[in-house]
Amino acid sequence: VSWAIYDPGHGGVDSGAVGPGGTRESDVNLSIAWQAHAATVMAHGESWLTRWADGCLSLANRAAQANYLDNAGAFVSIHCNSNGPDAHGFEVYHFPHSPAGITLATAIRDAVAHEVPALAMRGDRNGLKADGRLAVLRKTKMPAVLVECAFLSNPNEEAWLAKVETQVRLGRTIAGATMAFLAGRS
């Protein structure tokens, strides 16, 4: 059985982005990751979080945790974006030279587009973006993606991301796509 590794971005003194209404990215990321973990376990899958509470971890530590698990099959780093009040949408980053990473990114993008059709897709290829500079994509041994769920800098998306229902929906959708990806590789 392959494990899904969910990495709630930021944490501790590193809150990540903070929306105009005060919503902290690290808190939203952790909640979505917990929802993904719970959905995976409820579906009899195996899951691990790189951080289980509000604490600060280095990027190297996040990748090392995933690489330590022999059966880690997918690494999903969960984030919220920030780039001005008018920026909006969802995107998934993947390592440019990883066909499996591209497949995982596409699965998550497609699932979110289906479950949340009102959420615009951003990136180079309609919600997908290649980036070889991100440490968690570069240093993990398994297929890895970094999900930017929406923009905390946009007041409308911040209000949406702050809702528990949104966090549950995104977590379950990300988990479902990740588990389908893992099932296709076994």
Please name every model-derived segment.
Residues 2-4, 26-186:
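Active-site-proximal helix/loop segments of hydrolytic enzymes
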Residues 2-22:
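Short glycine-rich His-centered loop
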